[in-house]
Each structure stands twice: as C-alpha cells, then as structure tokens.
C-alpha cells in the first residue's frame, strides 16, 4: 500500500480457529511461514478507521482487530517505532545521562581499580603471612630438634652425674666400712693384748708368790730403803753442779 491512497475497508473477519483447529493463529505455528513485518504503519498506535484511510494516517495508525487475534489484517507494532524509541532513548541517555553515566562509570572504574589494588595488596599480605608462617614452622621444627638434642645431652650428663655420685658413695661406704672394720679389729686386738698382759701379770705374780718367800721380800725392801739416801745425795750434787755452771 502506497501513502496517499485510500485503504479499502477489510471484510468482516472470519474466525480461523475452527479451520485450523491447532490452537494458534496462522504464522505462529512451528511449521507456518513467518508473519509479515510491519516496518512503519502505526507509529502512534491502533486506530482501525484511520488506518483504513491511507496516506499519513497509515503512517500514524495501524490496524488491529481486538475481537479476532488471528485476523490476517492485524499488524504488529512497527519496526520504525522501535528504532525511533531506541534512538529517542539513546538521545535522552546521551543528552541527560552522559555525564552521570560517565561519572558513574568512572567511579565504578575507580572502585574496581581500588578493589583490584586492595585484592593485590591482600594477596601480597597473605603471601607474606604465609612465608612468615612457613618460616616459623621451619624454625619451630628446628627448635624442637634442638630441644630434643639438648634434653638428650642433658639426660646423658645427668645420668653420668648420678652414676659418678653412686660410684663415689659406693667407694666412700666401702672405705668407711673398711675403716670401721679396721678400727674394730684394732680394738679387738688391743682388748686381747690387754687381756693377755693382765693374764700374764696375774700369772707372773702367782708364779712369784709361789717361788719367792717372805725373807726374799724383806731383803728386797731393805735394799730399796738403803738405795734411797744415795739417790738423794746424788741428786743434790747434780743440782749444785747445775747451779754453779749457770752462775
């Protein structure tokens, strides 16, 4: 249909549901050919009477039968209207939303950049902490090994010290036992010697009593009494000589 020419009034629509019996309109089934494309009819909306007049009305209005959705004269919204709507929306977005959108995109970019920087920093910090933990774990294992070696060495030293003390105690106890045994042996010998001497003296006295009479005892006493003055005189002379020599 050309603009400016009157569009004939369509005949009364006949229901198509009975003829097809498939539950859908022609052109909407999986095997039906696609419906025609409305490029520019009805930029404003639906008006069946105005659409039938042709001319500029065909540009502004399109036909659509509300009673019969399967009417072959029905026209979908024009493709040009979608293009115009999209262009108008793009113009509005560019005219009024370019700066806010640009700022939002810039802010979003800064936010993403900051988040990436934070993520990179957190990753580096995590790697550093991981290295620190690994170093601490390594040092901990080394420290445990050193402690085990130190404890083993200390145990050996303590063992040697205990054995040395036990040996010294054993030697000292043996020496003390030997000393006590020797002292007891000496005491026993002394007691035996004393007892033997006493027994010998008693035996000698008894023997002398048996062999020496009373006359012999009197003679010994007299000789002893006679020897006393001579001993006193000799002692006096030696004392005088000593005094003269000192003078």
From Swiss-Prot:
Superkingdom to which the source organism belongs: Bacteria
Region spans: Disordered: 1-33
Membrane topology designation: Single-pass membrane protein
UniProt keyword Ligase, yes or no: no
This protein's record includes keyword Ion transport: yes
A single cellular component GO annotation: proton-transporting ATP synthase complex
Molecular function as annotated in GO: proton-transporting ATP synthase activity, rotational mechanism
Major subcellular location class: membrane
InterPro entries: ATP_synth_b/b'su_bac/chlpt (IPR002146)
Subcellular location: Cell inner membrane
Family according to the record: Belongs to the ATPase B chain family.
Quaternary organization: F-type ATPases have 2 components, F(1) - the catalytic core - and F(0) - the membrane proton channel. F(1) has five subunits: alpha(3), beta(3), gamma(1), delta(1), epsilon(1). F(0) has three main subunits: a(1), b(2) and c(10-14). The alpha and beta chains form an alternating ring which encloses part of the gamma chain. F(1) is attached to F(0) by a central stalk formed by the gamma and epsilon chains, while a peripheral stalk is formed by the delta and b chains.
Role: F(1)F(0) ATP synthase produces ATP from ADP in the presence of a proton or sodium gradient. F-type ATPases consist of two structural domains, F(1) containing the extramembraneous catalytic core and F(0) containing the membrane proton channel, linked together by a central stalk and a peripheral stalk. During catalysis, ATP synthesis in the catalytic domain of F(1) is coupled via a rotary mechanism of the central stalk subunits to proton translocation. Component of the F(0) channel, it forms part of the peripheral stalk, linking F(1) to F(0).
PANTHER family, alphabetized: ATP SYNTHASE SUBUNIT B, CHLOROPLASTIC
Name by which UniProt lists this protein: ATP synthase subunit b
Organism: Sorangium cellulosum (strain So ce56) (Polyangium cellulosum (strain So ce56))
Lineage, highest ranks first: Bacteria, Pseudomonadati, Myxococcota, Polyangia, Polyangiales
Gene: atpF
